[in-house]
Amino acid sequence: MARSLKKNPFVANHLLEKIEKLNMRAKKEIIVTWSRASTIIPTMIGHTIAIHNGKEHLPIFITDRMVGHKLGEFAPTLNFREHARNDNKSRR
C-alpha cells in the first residue's frame, strides 16, 4: 500500500541527522544504516549509503532516479542459488 500524501515520507531520524551533518560540511562519506524502510529523499542524492541486507552492508550510491523508493529495494536479502539437480542416473 502507498503511504498517504498527508503524511511525510518515512526517514529514520538518525539517518536524516547524519546526512544533514555531511551536507553542512560538504563531505562525502559512506553512511552505514540498518534502516531499510527509510524513503530516499532529494537530500540523499550523491551520498553512498551502506544498507544492511541481513548479513553485510551493501554500499549503494544514491542517484536522482532513486528518489521516492525505499533503501531496502536496492539491497536484496535473498540470493537464489539453483534448484537441486535431478540426478536420474544415481536412482537407477
UniProtKB/Swiss-Prot annotation:
UniProt gene name: rps19
Organism the protein comes from: Buxus microphylla
Key words, A-Z: Chloroplast, Plastid, Ribonucleoprotein, Ribosomal protein, RNA-binding, rRNA-binding
Disulfide bond annotation, renumbered to this chain: none
NADP keyword on record: no
GO cellular component: chloroplast; mitochondrial small ribosomal subunit
Protein name from the UniProt record: Small ribosomal subunit protein uS19c
GO molecular function, one term: rRNA binding
PANTHER family documented for this protein: RIBOSOMAL PROTEIN S19P FAMILY MEMBER (PTHR11880), SMALL RIBOSOMAL SUBUNIT PROTEIN US19M (PTHR11880:SF8)
Subcellular location: Plastid, Chloroplast
One GO term (biological process): translation
Family, similarity comment: Belongs to the universal ribosomal protein uS19 family.
Main location per the UniProt record: plastid
Membrane-spanning intervals of the chain: none
Function noted in UniProt: Protein S19 forms a complex with S13 that binds strongly to the 16S ribosomal RNA.
Domain of life according to the entry: Eukaryota
Keyword DNA damage in record: no
Xref: SUPFAM superfamilies: Ribosomal protein S19
